[in-house]
């Protein structure tokens, strides 16, 4: 961002000086110079928004304020791109993200596309010198996520993952209680998320003229256009996602590993059973129970809501930490419950563990773009949180227990499982 600011500042000041010399004294509004306490336009973070479907539309306004501005938007649906341009006050709308990334007035991008596009676009953005906010899941395979981690490090980019629960006080508080031993020795973590994600598609038909369908498919296999159901229901199709197991599950596996202090590691054994519906293009786990065992013996049990046991029944989502001396339950809606009840107000002392504090996920990203600090949800954590869901899916598809090495990110001596860590990507989008 600094090289853009310095160039713009020079040009702006040169223009002002030239105008003053030619016309004599003039009054420049303080807002233009940033002297009113606001941020001068030349010092604002220039943002590009890639993906303006439901999620993209929902999160975009949160990134815009006095310190940032929308420069350009992109969506493979031209009508969506045009509407987003008007809605966000951007200068240009594109249907090809490469054109957006080529702009030197964009400092950072917000990626909210279907998941099969996350890694290729994020890698291209990093190579183009942009900082990156990327929605979850990180990608569709462990291998592509690792390539992205390496790329972010190589190019020195700021990265924020869309696991916004880390910026909610009740989730941070729950993890601090667990990390500081308030429930004794942790032995079990149970998470539940909504099931579903498998859908029946419509009959093949010509794509609408507003849609660049080949670009929508991108690195995924070429298939016929099967109605807008494809655009609306991609999360239930394994070519584009891993269903709610990951699309939703990443949120709570992230909190589970944050509380367990394994956010940069992972389990060593995984097993489970999923109910897969054998529907063309849509063979995703509809309901599931998967169990991950860590090196310290702690078990993370991942449930769809329909399979959840008594402590979690009735809630469509939540995280339960169980220890030798108590438990902590946390979910959305600012819910935090503890056993014993007194734990809820237990003071975390200055010398104890205090986790990274963020009270607004978008603001944390923008602040880190300015300061070059690490975000609350950096890319390595994104990789490990996503990997939990991918490992559960692999074990369930194989129908057996698998052993995992979180250091090498491989299944030692298991060729069948290792083959599921990557997939063929359609050209020219290989990473």
Map each language-model feature to its residues.
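Active-site rim elements
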Residues: 161-163, 239-246, 274-279, 305-308, ...
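NAD(P)-dinucleotide binding in Rossmann-like oxidoreductases
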Residues: 280, 288-359
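A contiguous active-site-proximal alpha/beta segment in oxidoreductase catalytic domains
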Residues: 131, 139-215
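C-terminal helix-rich "cap/oligomerization" subdomain common to oxidoreductases
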Residues: 13-40, 367-431
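N-terminal glycine-/serine-/threonine-rich beta1-alpha1-beta2 phosphate-ribose binding loop
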Residues: 1-134, 143-158
